[in-house]
């Protein structure tokens, strides 16, 4: 029986009411000038992505194909967009699924590996860019 767990966390996770008021500062603190926003079609259709874009002082590309259970195909499409765009910062808007998609897409780009080879414990070979 397992008796311990390890938790790996981002240096900064910002969420909650009023987070949009801080988003510009959060992105600028990590040096974000070219931002890739990863979200889903619902949040995009609600205008949330537009509000974030207006709040940022950066060049922005949007990947709005997030899914409830992100597939490795969605990760590969997102990574392809990221490689072509070359963001210095990635911003996930939404819940855990969009954050998972963003993390795996960033790991795919930084490692140069196929997303299917990154699934499992300790498979990501190193740090990824600001997320």
Regions found by a protein language model. Name each.
Residues 1-89:
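ATP/NTP phosphate-donor binding region
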Residues 73-131:
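Glycine/threonine-rich beta-strand-loop-alpha-helix active-site module
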């Amino acid at each position: 029986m397992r008796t311990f767990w390890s938790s790996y966390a981002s240096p900064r996770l910002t969420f909650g009411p009023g987070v949009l008021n801080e988003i510009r500062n959060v992105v600028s603190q990590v040096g974000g000038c070219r931002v890739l926003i990863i979200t889903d079609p619902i949040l995009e259709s609600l205008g949330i992505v537009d509000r974030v874009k207006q709040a940022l002082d950066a060049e922005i590309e949007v990947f709005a194909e997030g899914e409830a259970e992100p597939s490795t195909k969605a990760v590969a499409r997102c990574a392809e967009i990221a490689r072509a765009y070359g963001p210095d910062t990635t911003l996930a808007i939404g819940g855990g699924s969009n954050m998972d998609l963003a993390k795996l897409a960033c790991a795919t780009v930084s490692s140069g590996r196929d997303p299917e080879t990154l699934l499992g414990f300790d498979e990501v070979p190193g740090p990824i860019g600001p997320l």
